[in-house]
């Protein structure tokens, strides 16, 4: 028996680089774009580090999106520098602040998407 698809999914890809520039794809569904934008605003994050790509990004989220799942792909701008898929693409480029912010962003988004405790 085939399992039902989720309503939404978040894909984290290459989010730990020092000096990261997280971009979501231009084709991100509006519902997920609003959640992402709200999180940036409420967390006070810089638009230099958190923004929207000017182009479509083919990544692990695409098969979900093609099946009607609202997707949010948080991905570092891999064209920013000459490290991607080279010998420079290693643990030495990772930064604690990048992981901290990405974790905070992800939790903030999840709090918006998941139902809260029942009202009494």
Where are the predicted features?
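Primarily recognizes the serine-hydrolase "nucleophile elbow" in alpha/beta-hydrolase
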Residues: 1-6
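Active-site-adjacent substrate-binding region
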Residues: 8, 15-120
